[in-house]
């Protein structure tokens, strides 16, 4: 016999079966989603309601701003930042490999060498293009 209660019970058991082991993850996901929403809402509700021309000016540590806020940076800053990010990400990828070096074996060692070789080629390319020169 088809019974609505038995159908809902079977559906509930199926949901519980699929979610078993993920309760902590779902709880963490819900809390980590709610905290920024609550913080932004609280800051919007508690902030002072100021209107006026001072609000549109740039803040320079309490000192009266001099000139415009638009400053054009040299492209060299971006090149250094890009090279830094590339090699910073390299260390993030190589650290777990170095920690588990003995368990991974020869194949992982060869893969890491290929990864390092590609990054060395990128460094040599950036060096030859003059991205690392400051002049």
Swiss-Prot record:
Keyword Amino-acid biosynthesis: no
Transmembrane domains' residue ranges: 15-35, 79-99, 104-124
Gene Ontology biological-process annotations: photosynthesis, light reaction
GO cellular component, one term: plasma membrane-derived thylakoid membrane
Subcellular location: Cellular thylakoid membrane
Gene3D superfamilies: NADH:ubiquinone/plastoquinone oxidoreductase, chain 3
InterPro entries in alphabetical order: NAD(P)H_OxRDtase_bac/plastid, NADH_UbQ/plastoQ_OxRdtase_su3, NDAH_ubi_oxred_su3_sf
Protein keywords: Membrane, NAD, NADP, Plastoquinone, Quinone, Thylakoid, Translocase, Transmembrane, Transmembrane helix, Transport
Entry EC no(s): 7.1.1.-
Membrane topology type: Multi-pass membrane protein
Gene Ontology terms, MF aspect: NADH dehydrogenase (ubiquinone) activity; quinone binding
Catalysed reactions, as listed in the record: a plastoquinone + NADH + (n+1) H(+)(in) = a plastoquinol + NAD(+) + n H(+)(out); a plastoquinone + NADPH + (n+1) H(+)(in) = a plastoquinol + NADP(+) + n H(+)(out)
Source species, domain of life: Bacteria
Matches recorded under Pfam families: Oxidored_q4
Assembly: NDH-1 can be composed of about 15 different subunits; different subcomplexes with different compositions have been identified which probably have different functions.
Sequence similarity: Belongs to the complex I subunit 3 family.
Function: NDH-1 shuttles electrons from an unknown electron donor, via FMN and iron-sulfur (Fe-S) centers, to quinones in the respiratory and/or the photosynthetic chain. The immediate electron acceptor for the enzyme in this species is believed to be plastoquinone. Couples the redox reaction to proton translocation, and thus conserves the redox energy in a proton gradient. Cyanobacterial NDH-1 also plays a role in inorganic carbon-concentration.
Name recorded for this polypeptide: NAD(P)H-quinone oxidoreductase subunit 3
